[in-house]
C-alpha cells in the first residue's frame, strides 16, 4: 500500500491496486521459478518495482495503458511496416510474435515459469521501446504504427498474466 501511495498519491482505488499488486507479486514470484527449484523468499524482493518481479510487469502494463490514454487511440488497423524498423520496435514485435509458441511449450512441459519468464521479456522489451520511441507524435501514420505496438504488447502482457492468475491494474 505504501509503495503504491508513494508512486501515485492521486491514484483512485489505491486499495484495489495494492491488493492486485500484492497478490500478483506473490503469484509471479512463485511461478517465475521452475517447479523443481528451491527459492529464497523475501518480501522486499517480490514487492520491488525493479528487477524480475510481478510488480515490474504489472507496472509495465499500466504504463502501456497510460500511453493509450494519452494518445487517445484505442484501435488501429493495418500499419505501414516500413515505419517501425528501429531496433527496439522490431525486437518487441519479434518477442510478441512468439506468444503462441511459448504457451504451447509451457503446456507441453507443464511449466508456468515459461510463461512468466516470457512475459518478463515482453515487459523488458516494451520498456526499451517506450524509452526510445515517442508515441504521441505529429505524424499520424507513425503515431498509429507505434500505438499498434503498444496495443499488442499490452494485450500479450495481459493474456500472459491472466494465464498465471494475475490481474493487471490499468493505473498504478
Stretches with model-predicted labels:
Residues 1-172:
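Non-catalytic interaction-recognition regions
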Amino acid at each position: 500500500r505504501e509503495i503504491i501511495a508513494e508512486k501515485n498519491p492521486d491514484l483512485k482505488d489505491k486499495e484495489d491496486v495494492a491488493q492486485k499488486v500484492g497478490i500478483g507479486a506473490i503469484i509471479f514470484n512463485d511461478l517465475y521459478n521452475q517447479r523443481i527449484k528451491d527459492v529464497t523468499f523475501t518480501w522486499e524482493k517480490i514487492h520491488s518495482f525493479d528487477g524480475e518481479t510481478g510488480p515490474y510487469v504489472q507496472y509495465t502494463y499500466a504504463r502501456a495503458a497510460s500511453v493509450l490514454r494519452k494518445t487517445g487511440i484505442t484501435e488501429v488497423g493495418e500499419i505501414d511496416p516500413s515505419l517501425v524498423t528501429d531496433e527496439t520496435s522490431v525486437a518487441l514485435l519479434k518477442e510478441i510474435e512468439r506468444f503462441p509458441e511459448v504457451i504451447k511449450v509451457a503446456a507441453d512441459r507443464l511449466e508456468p515459469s515459461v510463461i512468466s519468464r516470457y512475459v518478463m521479456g515482453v515487459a523488458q522489451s516494451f520498456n526499451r521501446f517506450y524509452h526510445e520511441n515517442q508515441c504521441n507524435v505529429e505524424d499520424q501514420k507513425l503515431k498509429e504504427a507505434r500505438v499498434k505496438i503498444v496495443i499488442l504488447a499490452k494485450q500479450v502482457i495481459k493474456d500472459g498474466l491472466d494465464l498465471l492468475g494475475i490481474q493487471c491494474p490499468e493505473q498504478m
